């Protein structure tokens, strides 16, 4: 869910970027998703 996503992002980047910057990040972070993940963070979004 989006609350867990927000918590994961805050933990992973140590608060260096606001969570909202990732809502439309890569191919899988945010709503829906398709294609090839662009990096490890996007791959994590694909998995979860």
Curated annotation (Swiss-Prot):
Short name of one Pfam family: Phospholip_A2_1
Keywords assigned: Calcium, Disulfide bond, Hemostasis impairing toxin, Hydrolase, Lipid degradation, Lipid metabolism, Metal-binding, Platelet aggregation inhibiting toxin, Secreted, Toxin
Tissue expression per record: Expressed by the venom gland.
GO annotation (BP), single: arachidonate secretion
Active-site residues annotated for this sequence: 48
EC number: 3.1.1.4
Binding site for Ca(2+): 28, 30, 32
Gene3D superfamilies listed in its UniProt record: Phospholipase A2 domain
Cofactor binding: number and manner: Binds 1 Ca(2+) ion.
UniProt subcellular location: Secreted
Enzyme class: hydrolase
Paired cysteines (S-S): 29-45
InterPro entries: PLipase_A2, PLipase_A2_dom, PLipase_A2_dom_sf
Record's protein name: Phospholipase A2 superbin d
Organism of origin: Austrelaps superbus
């Amino acid at each position: 869910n989006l609350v867990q996503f927000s918590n994961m992002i805050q933990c992973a980047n140590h608060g260096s970027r606001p969570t909202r910057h990732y809502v439309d990040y890569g191919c899988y972070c945010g709503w829906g998703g398709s294609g090839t993940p662009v990096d490890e963070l996007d791959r994590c979004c694909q998995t979860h």
